[in-house]
Amino acid sequence: GPLAVAINAAYMQTYIGGVSCPYICSRRLNHGVLLVGYGSAGYAPIRLKEKPYWVIKNSWGENWGENGYYKICRGRNICGVDSMVSTVAAVHTTSQ
């Protein structure tokens, strides 16, 4: 399921689409989002291969980003996205 993550949202404010890799983004966390998926797409000229990314669902509505979603580079803790991750685990108990 989705993971709750914290991120630095400075570069999210101007995002309109594609895979965002703001390497100069601070890792100071200031916004909560949901990590809902991952993938790889596009051409990364530096490495001559596809760019892996996380798919983030934001709370700013469907008119922001790609219908309310954000793709950010995966694997380098860009904007602190890998720093604070939370999930919920269900515990099933039996009653006697």
From Swiss-Prot:
The active site is at H31, N58. Coiled coil: none annotated. GO terms for molecular function: cysteine-type peptidase activity. Keywords: Disulfide bond, Hydrolase, Protease, Thiol protease. Disulfide bonds join C25-C79. Its EC number is 3.4.22.-. The keyword Protease applies. GO terms for biological process: proteolysis. InterPro entries: Papain-like_cys_pep_sf, Pept_asp_AS, Pept_his_AS, Peptidase_C1A, Peptidase_C1A_C. The keyword Nucleus does not apply. It comes from the Eukaryota. Transmembrane segments: none annotated. Pfam families: Peptidase_C1. Belongs to the peptidase C1 family. This is Cysteine proteinase.
